UniProtKB/Swiss-Prot annotation:
This is DNA-directed RNA polymerase subunit Rpo5. Keywords: Cytoplasm, DNA-directed RNA polymerase, Nucleotidyltransferase, Transcription, Transferase. It catalyses: RNA(n) + a ribonucleoside 5'-triphosphate = RNA(n+1) + diphosphate. InterPro entries: Arch_Rpo5/euc_Rpb5, RNA_pol_subH/Rpb5_C, RNA_pol_subH/Rpb5_CS, RPB5-like_sf. Part of the RNA polymerase complex. It is found in: Cytoplasm. It comes from Metallosphaera sedula (strain ATCC 51363 / DSM 5348 / JCM 9185 / NBRC 15509 / TH2). GO terms for molecular function: DNA binding; DNA-directed RNA polymerase activity. Gene3D superfamilies: RPB5-like RNA polymerase subunit.
Length: 83
């Protein structure tokens, strides 16, 4: 069995929410609003398929925007760690 060299882009799947790496300024603003340090956010490994797709590096903060029929739009944040 041969492994395929094709890369699959998980961001095009209908069930995968929008992911984006925040700039340093945006990350600082979010952390200040939440009153927490980056390590207190839920973690996302740098090896996560979406982290690799958006080129997130350890130390980055990723903004994830989910669409929900109940709340409309839900924004969550993840702190990227190595692994």
């Amino acid at each position: 069995m041969r492994s395929s060299s094709k890369k699959i882009d998980p961001s095009v799947h209908v069930l995968v929410p929008k992911h984006e790496v925040l700039s340093v300024e945006e990350a600082f603003k979010v952390l200040k609003e939440l009153g927490i340090g980056p390590e207190q956010l839920p973690w996302m490994r740098a090896s996560d398929p979406m982290a690799r797709t958006i080129n997130a590096k350890p130390g980055d903060i990723v903004k994830i925007t989910r669409k929900s029929p109940i709340v409309g739009e839900l924004v969550v944040y993840r702190y990227v760690v190595s692994g």
